[in-house]
Structure formats: C-alpha cells, structure tokens
Swiss-Prot record:
This is Ribosomal RNA large subunit methyltransferase E. Keywords: Cytoplasm, Methyltransferase, rRNA processing, S-adenosyl-L-methionine, Transferase. Belongs to the class I-like SAM-binding methyltransferase superfamily. RNA methyltransferase RlmE family. The active site is at K161. It catalyses: uridine(2552) in 23S rRNA + S-adenosyl-L-methionine = 2'-O-methyluridine(2552) in 23S rRNA + S-adenosyl-L-homocysteine + H(+). S-adenosyl-L-methionine binds at G60, W62, D80, D96, D121. It holds the Pfam family FtsJ. It is found in: Cytoplasm. InterPro entries: RNA_methyltr_RlmE, RNA_MeTrfase_FtsJ_dom, rRNA-MeTfrase_E, SAM-dependent_MTases_sf.
Length: 216
C-alpha cells in the first residue's frame, strides 16, 4: 500500500511539473532538456560545428538540444543503457556504459579524431540508501571523466551530473587538475528535492597538462 501511495504521489508530481508540461508543448522528449538549455544560456557551452558525446542520453532530451545547436556540420554520439528513438544525424550506442564493450563501441564511433565536448547526465537507479547510491553515482562520474580524458581535444569541455555526498570532494579535487576552470551549476529546472548538480569543466589540459600540474 505504501508503495502504491508513493507511486501515485510521483505520478501526480510528474504530470503537474511545469517543466514536464513545457517539454510536451515544446516537443522535447524530457524535462531534462531545460537543464541543458539553462546551462547553455548562461555559459554558451555548445556551438555550431562541434563534435559532442552525450552519455546517459535516453530518452533524448539533451541530444535534441545538442543536435539543434551543433547543426548539420556538427557530430553527436549518444549512448545509454536504455533504448532511444532515433534522432536525425545522431549516432546512438545502446548498452551499459560500465561494460568495456560499450566503451569500445563509443571509441570506435569517435575514430581517430578528438571531440570538443563530453556531456553526461548519467545517474544510477536510486534506492534511497546513500551508502548504496553514492558509490554507484560516483562510479558513473569516474567513468565519464575517464572517457573525457581519452577523447577530448586540448581546450575541450566536460559537463557532468554529480551528487553531493561521499566521494564528491575527492572527485572535485581530481577534476580540477584536468581542467583550467571548474564551476558548479544547479539549474532552476532541477527538482528542489534533488541532490543533483552539474560540474562545468572548461579548458581540458590534456594528459600532459594534468601531469605537469601534478608535479607542482
């Protein structure tokens, strides 16, 4: 019974959510589109012609926004453990990003080139138990950062969803070694009760740049 009440409450909140209604009106697949749009309005992260990887892409809200902004000369590779309906000119890699085979497929799609931007809205299925949820969430953050380190061009950018809790401070410390500037963003469209926020990382230093920083 308690579970049914919780589910009903979630459904009521979801359908009364102004961003859900706005997404339906504007043709976006997810309310999450507005999180990226808010960051874009503030930081001008995405530009025409860019090469971008979108992690945790399904159902496609961020990919819709990104594809429109990069235009026909850009390139977008999206990936998620869930299926995603196709978006024109978007390469989709379906599978569990924690598996090496999926990483290999993404790297194959990237090819010998580098990308300008990696964005990650990945999050685990939450149990409500911080001792379980935080390690899972931080593991996904670490994997996203690992990919960014492999594929970003020097000067490239990285946007990643994070959660405050155990492991965050160490992650934040490490990421600051790799980028010239790291800022926190909490879009208005994030739900009030959510502990999520985003780290906006500008100016990838490259592996050599990070190693040089480590020496000082």
């Amino acid at each position: 019974m308690a579970r049914s009440k919780t589910s009903l409450k979630w459904l009521q909140e979801h359908f009364n959510d102004p961003y859900v209604k706005k997404a339906q009106k504007d043709g976006y697949r997810s309310r999450a589109s507005y999180k990226l749009l808010e960051i874009q309005d503030k930081d001008k992260l995405i530009r025409p012609g860019m090469s971008v990887i979108d992690l945790g892409a399904a159902p496609g809200g961020w990919s819709q926004v990104t594809s429109r902004l990069i235009g026909g000369q850009g390139r977008l590779i999206a990936s998620d453990i869930l299926e995603m309906d196709s978006i024109p000119d978007v390469t989709f890699v379906h599978g569990d990003f924690t598996q090496d085979t999926v990483l290999a497929q993404i790297l194959e799609a990237v090819g010998n080139s580098q990308v300008d931007l990696v964005i990650s809205d990945m999050a685990p299925n939450m149990s409500g138990l911080p001792a379980v949820d935080m390690p899972r969430a931080m593991f996904l953050c670490e994997l996203a950062l690992d990919l960014a380190g492999r594929v970003l061009r020097p000067g490239g950018d990285f946007l990643v969803k994070v959660f405050q809790g155990e492991g965050f401070d160490e992650y934040h410390k490490n990421i600051r070694k790799l980028f010239d500037k790291v800022q926190t963003r909490k879009p208005d469209s994030s739900r009030d009760r959510s502990r999520e926020q985003y780290l906006l990382c500008r100016g990838f230093r490259g592996v050599e740049g990070a190693a040089s920083e480590e020496r000082f």
